[in-house]
């Protein structure tokens, strides 16, 4: 006898745990150009990794509209990707990512149809990579330093708050060119 998965849909239209209902995937360019990419996506991968502090992913698409030209999409941290989704257990979630690279670009026909992959990550990852801290921290706990570093160097407007487990002992350390996340480790 085969176990059958329940087929009743919840309010989000998903059937099984692990199902994801993608709402919108909107490209926002620096010049104000916006486009919903949902209908031209071939594959979307969003990765959370226990060895990485930041979410990252790739979006492969077949572009019949010439978005690389009209956006333009440079992949140098100038464009944003807004992803909205639902799961069986959550209300709608909207995540903002920064596109840092365009790869695997290939022309599919003589017109403007192209296939390519957009590589993206969180805005905090870009800020972390761009900054080095040369500073001595004294008179606080490690959890207080983590909150301070997040607020001063990584926090983005509308971004998530940092959840930190309180620590007990007052300590000091010196950052000699570490990134903000290296200081928070």
Predicted features along the sequence, with ranges:
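Charged- and aromatic-enriched interaction segments used to assemble
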Residues: 110-185
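Assembly/oligomerization scaffold segments
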Residues: 1-127
